[in-house]
Amino acid sequence: LVSDKAYKAGVRSPKDLNGKRYAVTQSGSSFHYMGSKMAAAENIKLSFVPLQKVGAIIGALKSGQVDAWSIVPHIAKPLSRGGSIHIIGNVADYLPNYQITTVFTSSNNANNERALTKNFLTGFSKGVDDYASTMIDKNKGDAGVNEMVDLIHKYVYTSRPREKAAPSIINGTMRLSDGASLNLASIKNQLEWFKSEGLVKKSITIDTLVDQSYVKIIS
């Protein structure tokens, strides 16, 4: 996303962002990682501006205090409808296999509470399968979607009435990894980036970070 100010100044694609102010919540955030990878691919320099909260970033982008930001489509699309913010590219073009979310636990649980951890993953994976079948593949039709929205609304957007929460729940639908599988190449890439930015110790290895014995590993 870019501000209207940047858009009117000629920013039409990510390659036009050289020297621009790119909003992040904080150093090391997914926003920082995505912006950094995009900048490296386009061979440009960005000035990263930490603003802590998403609401603050949206306000700064609308007012032109920052030039660009990246956010999930179900938030980006409504923001782009008002004219003060424009969509100019897709993160997936730069990180096509980006593992943005994982299931994680303490090393004690992974090492010493194996049955508990495996049972959680089994239950979690069943929930993911039900969610994908209903919300993405629509195997139960509109009635199934509505039933799932009712269930999700008990925990998400609870401050909104159901009719106002439903569009956000539906628009935020995404396919999660089957069986909580891990794209190890993506995780390695992220770990190396954290090291290059001085955000984690150089001594940390992929085996420190990932227990590969629990789920399917995608390399």
State each model region's role.
Residues 78-92, 163:
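Ligand-binding "clamshell"
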Residues 111-201:
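Secondary-structure end/capping motifs
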